[in-house]
Swiss-Prot record:
Its EC number is 2.4.2.18. GO terms for biological process: L-tryptophan biosynthetic process. Belongs to the anthranilate phosphoribosyltransferase family. It catalyses: N-(5-phospho-beta-D-ribosyl)anthranilate + diphosphate = 5-phospho-alpha-D-ribose 1-diphosphate + anthranilate. Mg(2+) 1 binds at residues 94, 228. Keywords: Amino-acid biosynthesis, Aromatic amino acid biosynthesis, Glycosyltransferase, Magnesium, Metal-binding, Transferase, Tryptophan biosynthesis. The keyword ATP-binding does not apply. This is Anthranilate phosphoribosyltransferase. Binds 2 magnesium ions per monomer. Its cofactor is Mg(2+). Mg(2+) 2 binds at residues 227-228. One of its GO terms (molecular function) is magnesium ion binding. Pfam families: Glycos_trans_3N, Glycos_transf_3.
Amino acid sequence: MKPQAILARILEQRETPYEEMVELMRAIMSGNVSPAMTAALMTGLRMKRESIGEITAAAQVMRELALHIEVADSVNLVDTCGTGGDGCNTFNISTASAFVAAAADAQVAKHGGRSVSSKAGSADVLEAIGIHLNQTPDQIAQSITEVGIGFMFAPNFHHAMKHAAPVRRELGVRTLFNILGPLTNPAGAKNQLLGVFNEDLTGILAQALLRLGSQHAMIVHGSDGLDEITISGPTKIAELKEGEIREYTVQPEDFGLERTAIESLQVNSTDDARVMLLSVLDNHPGPARDIVLLNAGAAIYVAGKADSWAEGVEIARDKLASGAAKEKMLALIKFSNQLTH
């Protein structure tokens, strides 16, 4: 397998066979492919559009090479990690949703990193509220079990990514690596709310997660480009549940929520993102809380803590109103800081 031959095939708009893609990803992850070639391959795949097989093969390799977290009871384990790269610069909706889901007794294995293309990544905002990021796999497993939520700082678990990280940073555009992060949860969460930057990826990633053994997942893309369930208009959903995939569209009005432009959710800095996150967890009414209700409700549903998405939204509303979601945030801050003393 020569990367040059694979690149030539990609430029002809042809798919890379599964085994060759596995071999290529292992070579990239071990530093045996030059930065220039890695950049060319990632750009070529993006222009061709990555296939289900290519994505699944690459995710399989990343899963093999990742540090793993063992959570004793993982039936209700859920991740709310999205691809990012939507260019919308909203506050950290999936991070806020993670605390609400944890308050609803879902076990949240939140996976994420620093910002690549947004104003604040999940790691940036969690650090800003006082959470210690550098925890061991055992400590995070304990956090998930005892607090109900743990945060896995992606660079600490995907050491093999160090070879591709400089290329990804320098390119500054969405590539296969944006897609892989949410498919490679170190705790092996089989339930996911996964936001994507492109509508076409909803069905593709549902198929990839099916092949990778997921249990219940919702892959979502807002009509405004948001890699979340949006409140500004329709959201395209591909839902994987017990081996079946169903595709449909929802509107905020379906859940009794008012349609609002996403400009009110945009931030210019990590501190802006922190302030908006805390405002939601303080249950301040408005578009930020509404969009978290939609997304947290979906996370609660896929985690098996609600029989329907609508019920999940009502549970989310209750957990914000009671202060339980904010308590989860405070508990995680306390737990993570105990580890450093």
